[in-house]
Amino acid sequence: MALDPLGAVVLQSIMALSGRLALAALRLWGPGGGRRPISLCVGASGGFGGGGSSEKKFSLQDVAELLRTRACSRVVVMVGAGISTPSGIPDFRSPGSGLYSNLQQYDIPYPEAIFELGFFFHNPKPFFMLAKELYPGHYRPNVTHYFLRLLHDKELLLRLYTQNIDGLERASGIPASKLVEAHGTFVTATCTVCRRSFPGEDIWADVMADRVPRCPVCTGVVKPDIVFFGEQLPARFLLHMADFALADLLLILGTSLEVEPFASLSEAVQKSVPRLLINRDLVGPFVLSPRRKDVVQLGDVVHGVERLVDLLGWTQELLDLMQRERGKLDGQDR
């Protein structure tokens, strides 16, 4: 039976993506980023898709127009740590931070060891100290999270792929069905011995009390479903690879695009699909393999998002949404 045209495109894209991901083992190599923004449009002469320099370069205004007119309505978003730092989330890898100093009492060989299973089984306390700091509820979503929520509310968001484990996408009101949490979540937890699954709130009291949570059945350590080095990515990461074949716009915000296989997804959309990077630095394919419809907004991520929102004419809607949602979060804290 022949595939319809859209089905053929999806199949071809999945096959191409699978080939690229086969080169990057489906293992997590590590957990996943001002000045005023500078707008940079990558021209046709150096990009995929050919064409001469006379072709019109794509701009942030063009991206805004596609969204405003709903010419693009299947938006896939990729985000990293850079969207959460404005919420005040500390970097445990940065010397001088209180969290880094607190973790040093455990004689950690290097910060990333916290996410290594061997070290975790030897001494799980450093991870749970970090978990206590990052557990949902400690930090609030910022402008960028609520912009993504607004995309969902306007039925423009196909899927949001996040490297973050802070849960701020959920806290902004984006439903779980729209999320692929590539590096895991605190929403669920699993016993490392008997593999029983638990709701994340079941271990919350232990984590907040600086106790290592234990399975009530076998007494094994119960670990939040955060992806450690060498662990398989969540099944949803694979189930939604077709999203990139269906996408008509790709937004990439606040990520270094260094961690595979997440980083390879940035090249998984069709070559005709616009890609917008809002980031502190020029990264990944925007350096190595730019395309004609690439747009780069360099600088502070929040400032870049605010500029896009202004071009969209959504500023007041975003402010109203933030006020409503922050009021709800304040009510939950009482």
Swiss-Prot record:
Q: How does it assemble?
A: Upon metabolic stress, forms a complex composed of FOXO3, SIRT3 and mitochondrial RNA polymerase POLRMT; the complex is recruited to mtDNA in a SIRT3-dependent manner. Also forms a complex composed of FOXO3, SIRT3, TFAM and POLRMT. Interacts with NDUFA9, ACSS1, IDH2 and GDH. Interacts with PCCA.
Kindly state which reaction or reactions the protein catalyses: N(6)-acetyl-L-lysyl-[protein] + NAD(+) + H2O = 2''-O-acetyl-ADP-D-ribose + nicotinamide + L-lysyl-[protein]; N(6)-[(S)-lactoyl]-L-lysyl-[protein] + NAD(+) + H2O = 2''-O-(S)-lactoyl-ADP-D-ribose + nicotinamide + L-lysyl-[protein]
Tell me, using the record's free text, what induces this protein. Sirt3 expression decreases by 50% in skeletal muscle upon fasting.
* Active site feature: 183 (proton acceptor)
| InterPro entries linked to this entry | DHS-like_NAD/FAD-binding_dom (IPR029035), NAD-dep_sirtuin_deacylases (IPR050134), Sirtuin (IPR003000), Sirtuin_cat_small_dom_sf (IPR026591), Sirtuin_class_I (IPR017328), Ssirtuin_cat_dom (IPR026590)
Q: Which residues carry this modification: N6-succinyllysine?
A: 57
Q: Which UniProt keywords apply?
A: Cytoplasm, Metal-binding, Mitochondrion, NAD, Transferase, Transit peptide, Zinc
Q: What does this protein do?
A: NAD-dependent protein deacetylase. Activates or deactivates mitochondrial target proteins by deacetylating key lysine residues. Known targets include ACSS1, IDH, GDH, PDHA1, SOD2, LCAD, SDHA, MRPL12 and the ATP synthase subunit ATP5PO. Contributes to the regulation of the cellular energy metabolism. Important for regulating tissue-specific ATP levels. In response to metabolic stress, deacetylates transcription factor FOXO3 and recruits FOXO3 and mitochondrial RNA polymerase POLRMT to mtDNA to promote mtDNA transcription.
Tissues expressed in: Expressed in cardiomyocytes (at protein level). Expressed in the brain, liver, kidney and testes. Expressed in skeletal muscles (at protein level).
Describe the outcome of a gene knockout. Answer: Decreased muscle endurance under energetically demanding conditions. Decreased Mn-SOD activity in liver, increased mitochondrial superoxide levels and genomic instability upon exposure to ionizing radiations. In vivo ATP levels are reduced by 50 % in organs that normally express high levels of this protein. ATP levels are unchanged in organs that normally express low levels of this protein. Leads to increased mitochondrial protein acetylation. Decreased ceramide accumulation in brain mitochondria.
Q: Name one GO molecular function term.
A: NAD-dependent protein lysine delactylase activity
The family database entries (PROSITE patterns) matched by this protein are listed as: SIRTUIN
Quote the cellular component terms of the Gene Ontology held in the record: cytoplasm; membrane; mitochondrial inner membrane; mitochondrial matrix; mitochondrion; protein-containing complex
Enzyme's top EC category: transferase
The UniProt note on the cofactor reads as follows: Binds 1 zinc ion per subunit.
Q: Name one Pfam family in it.
A: SIR2
Q: Write out the residues that bind NAD(+).
A: 80-100, 163-166, 254-256, 279-281
- Identification of the protein by name: NAD-dependent protein deacetylase sirtuin-3
Domain of life of the native organism: Eukaryota
Q: Per the UniProt entry, what is one GO biological process? A: positive regulation of ceramide biosynthetic process
What cofactor is needed?
Zn(2+)
The species this protein belongs to is: Mus musculus (Mouse)
Q: Which family does it belong to?
A: Belongs to the sirtuin family. Class I subfamily.
